[in-house]
């Protein structure tokens, strides 16, 4: 049933805890918003198939924890990822100032040298903005990143963020083509073990879920 899918892509969402990574993911995949959603523990994972400029791609989207205590899981997150969304909260200058650290992490652990990076300024619906659009755009340009402002609450910019990221990845064949075939996403045994510290049952379930799709 997936014979018309051009490729399968691994996308990461990273950033400080509380910037709305999970909310962006749920808005994009399920079109839902929960104002009381809790912090991600370790990593969450969802699959969504989208069509961009006539090309159908299956996305395996990893929503990562922003807490320092989960950083030991980092190498497993980045392995094989073709795209990463770095998120900050436009109403929190601190989350914007932390972007340099997150970008350093991306560049350190990414196994794809041409990984496409998208910067998303989330929560533009909130009052008390501390980071204006120009600052976000300048940061993105300085680091050769795509850029958009969004609101998971109102939907604004969410779909477009993922579509533009996927479009750019597809325009970079070396990221997803291998020996003439589309790239795949796998959860290795080493990766499963590296992440098992959070919850063995959780990661077994996650591993089983991934195998259903890939």
Question: Residue spans of the language-model regions?
Answer:
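Short, conserved catalytic or interaction motifs in soluble domains
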Residues: 16, 30, 35, 89-92, ...
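Switch I (effector-binding) loop of TRAFAC-class P-loop GTPase G-domains
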Residues: 30-56
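Switch II (G3) loop of P-loop NTPases
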Residues: 57-70
């Amino acid at each position: 049933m997936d014979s018309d899918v051009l490729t399968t892509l691994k996308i990461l969402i990273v950033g400080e805890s509380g910037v709305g990574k999970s909310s962006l993911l749920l808005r994009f995949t399920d079109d839902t918003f929960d104002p009381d959603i809790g912090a991600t523990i370790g990593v969450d994972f969802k699959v969504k198939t989208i069509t961009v400029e006539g090309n159908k791609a299956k996305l395996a989207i990893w929503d990562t924890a922003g807490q320092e205590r989960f950083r030991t899981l980092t190498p497993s997150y980045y392995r094989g990822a073709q795209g990463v969304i770095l998120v900050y909260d436009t109403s929190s200058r601190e989350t914007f100032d932390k972007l340099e650290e997150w970008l350093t992490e991306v560049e350190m652990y990414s196994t794809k040298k041409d990984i496409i990076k998208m910067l998303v300024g989330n929560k533009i619906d909130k009052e008390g903005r501390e980071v204006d659009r120009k600052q976000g755009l300048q940061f993105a340009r300085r680091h050769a990143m795509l850029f958009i402002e969004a609101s998971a609450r109102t939907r604004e910019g969410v779909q477009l963020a993922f579509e533009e990221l996927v479009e750019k990845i597809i325009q970079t064949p070396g990221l997803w083509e291998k020996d003439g075939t589309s790239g795949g996403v796998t959860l290795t045994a080493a990766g499963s073990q590296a992440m098992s510290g959070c919850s063995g049952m959780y990661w077994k379930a996650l591993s089983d879920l991934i195998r259903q799709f890939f």
